[in-house]
């Protein structure tokens, strides 16, 4: 209890200092007030911990003095989800004094009722383990499905335990012969991304049509396939054709981030930490094929454009039109903004000199944060140096401001 007394003295000193600061002319400063509040909080925590530790020691001493049968009966009164240490701080022990002795018969009666409820709960759990309901449901399900008409399927679907026993979409209807269940081959795993959406632009229909197994019956295919009007919205191939998955582009083209520069109103698309047009210029980029980008990808190579406040609806319509049609001379490509280099003038950026200074200061460590190029053996042929410098300056605007702000 010596630590508790020290904590009490700290509390009294802190309270006196806070109270005296109201009457003084200058008062105590803000950092001193915060320091006093911090000391006050720590002292309170220490006092409470010492208080509860003392109560716990008293409880342990009382349990050691009690007979073992009474101690076991007290531990059995604890709730199922409550630990034994939490049961120690009951109303009998925390109250203390003659008041607790006066309430002892009532508390014992309440604990006895809790014990009976706990025993009843355990008996119900044991009964459920001995007589599980799903077994009887599954045992009676084949007879009900085989002998009942087709209208009983709705009644079975209302039962929560038999929800998994409903026949699938491709199951035979009423009047057809029910074949016995045979251990057939396991269902095939979902095909690879290349099988879902092939890279050949001559077969665009395969991306939106569901894949059909060679040995499947026509009736099963007709029953399992959704209507033609909902096929684009329900099939994953349609979305893979419009928005290619990260695995289609390779490892280094997996993420895409669009950054809006609030000062210059420039929208910059950064993929996995570097500009996508730098990736497209690479001769070994898997998302653009082997070689330089063709004329079909010229409209999708640039990712920077001017941003105006009233241009969202017009841009959405243009993007919707770009998604509907594939590039005539290339493979399906990620939806990227059109190149508008004529609208963008990097010389008008107010912090171009600051950006160049930051680039020279940070050096390769800062350039590695924005552009992550391949190995030296896979470097593309050098492009126009002035254009690359302008693109780098424009893309570094938001990054440098964020670093300077922090």
Curated annotation (Swiss-Prot):
Compositionally biased tracts (Pro residues): 182-193
The segments labelled Disordered in the record are: 166-195, 216-235
Q: Which Pfam families match?
A: IER
**Highest taxon of the source?**
Eukaryota
Residue pairs linked by disulfide bridges in the UniProt entry = none
Instruction: State the family named in the UniProt similarity comment for this chain.
Output: Belongs to the IER family.
Q: Which PANTHER family match?
A: IMMEDIATE EARLY RESPONSE GENE
Please give the name of this protein.
Immediate early response gene 5-like protein
Q: Which organism is it from?
A: Mus musculus (Mouse)
Underlying gene: Ier5l
């Amino acid at each position: 209890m010596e630590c508790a007394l020290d904590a009490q003295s700290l509390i009294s000193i802190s309270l006196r200092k806070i109270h005296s600061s109201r009457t003084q002319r200058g008062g105590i400063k803000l950092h001193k007030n915060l320091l006093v509040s911090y000391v006050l909080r720590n002292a309170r925590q220490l006092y409470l911990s010492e208080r509860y530790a003392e109560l716990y020691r008293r409880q342990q001493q009382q349990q050691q003095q009690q007979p073992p049968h009474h101690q076991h009966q007290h531990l059995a009164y604890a709730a199922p989800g409550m630990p034994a240490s939490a049961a120690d701080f009951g109303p009998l022990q925390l109250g203390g004094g003659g008041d607790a002795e006066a309430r002892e018969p009532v508390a014992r009666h309440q604990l006895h009722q809790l014990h009976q409820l706990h025993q009843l709960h355990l008996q119900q759990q044991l009964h459920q383990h001995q007589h599980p309901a799903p077994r009887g449901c599954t045992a009676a399900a084949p007879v009900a499905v085989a002998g009942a008409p087709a209208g009983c399927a709705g009644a079975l679907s209302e039962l929560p335990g038999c929800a998994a026993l409903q026949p699938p979409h491709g199951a035979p209807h009423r009047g057809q012969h029910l074949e016995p269940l045979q251990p057939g081959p396991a269902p095939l795993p979902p095909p690879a991304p290349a099988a879902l959406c092939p890279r050949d632009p001559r077969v665009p229909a395969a991306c939106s049509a569901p894949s059909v197994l060679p040995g499947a019956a026509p009736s099963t295919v007709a029953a399992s396939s959704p209507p033609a009007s909902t096929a684009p919205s329900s099939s994953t191939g349609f979305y893979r054709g419009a928005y290619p998955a990260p695995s289609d582009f390779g490892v280094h083209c997996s993420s895409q981030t669009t950054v809006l520069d609030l000062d210059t109103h420039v929208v910059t698309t950064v993929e996995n930490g570097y500009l996508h047009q730098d990736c497209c210029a690479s001769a070994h980029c898997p998302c653009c094929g082997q070689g330089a980008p063709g004329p079909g990808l010229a409209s999708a190579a640039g990712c920077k454009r001017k941003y105006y406040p009233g241009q969202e609806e017009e841009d959405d319509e243009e993007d919707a039109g770009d998604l509907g049609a594939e590039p005539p001379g290339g493979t399906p490509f990620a939806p990227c903004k059109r190149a508008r280099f004529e609208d963008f003038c990097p010389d008008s950026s107010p912090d171009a000199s600051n950006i160049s200074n930051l680039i020279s200061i940070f050096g390769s460590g800062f350039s590695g944060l924005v552009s992550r190029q391949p190995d030296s053996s896979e470097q593309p042929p050098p492009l126009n140096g002035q254009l690359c410098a302008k693109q780098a300056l424009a893309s570094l605007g938001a990054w440098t401001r964020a670093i300077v702000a922090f």
